Amino acid sequence: AFYRKDESMVTDYPLMNTSSRVGHADIIKYPMAGMSSHQVLLGVYNFNTNKTIYINTGEPQEQYLTNISWGTQDRYIYIAVLNRDQNHLKFNQYSAIDGSFIKTLFEEKSDQYVQPLHAMEFISDDTFLWRSERNGFDNFYLYNTDGKLVKQVLEKDHVVKDYYGYNNDNIYFSSFTKDGLGVDLWMVS
């Protein structure tokens, strides 16, 4: 799979570069509020057929495609589709064969913003972990591929630092201590 971004409709924005003796403006593309944003496509190239298909993520074109993951059998691609305001996420499943939309597994909404930073982690062919701050803390949620929330994995108010993996029905991760000065290693079933 590959990601293609078109910024041709985005306004140029100057950033002052003062790293050299004489400063100069570096021009970047920056989508100012109320102006056009970049547009993205996600494509899948099939080496056997030498053909490319594009994932049908739908409208609007000004959206963010993030946390892209392959399914365990390589038949599906999962994408967190985030609106431009970054306050509404749809976690969608698409066909890797023809690019068609299959279903929305779940949605996350916030009055402030949704910040999807971590891709899904499959722990079996039909269950996966999703990491989210939807309860105000960085937490793990166990879902099945039908989109059903099986459970919130952590009952305590953890601020997860790193996810290390899954083995023998256990999730391994580290989180900051309550005072924020230390890090604890955890194993949760």
Language-model segments: what does each one mean?
Residues 1-8, 169-189:
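Repeat-solenoid scaffold signature
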Residues 1-3, 27-34, 38-41, 56-82, ...:
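Conserved beta-propeller blade repeats
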Residues 2-54:
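Predominantly five- to eight-bladed beta-propeller fold
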Residues 6, 48, 83, 134, ...:
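A broadly conserved detector of short glycine/acidic/proline-rich loop/turn motifs that flank catalytic sites
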Residues 9-15, 39-41, 86-93, 136-141, ...:
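Structural motif
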Residues 46-50, 96-99, 144-148, 189:
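Short loop/turn segments that connect beta-strands within beta-propeller blades
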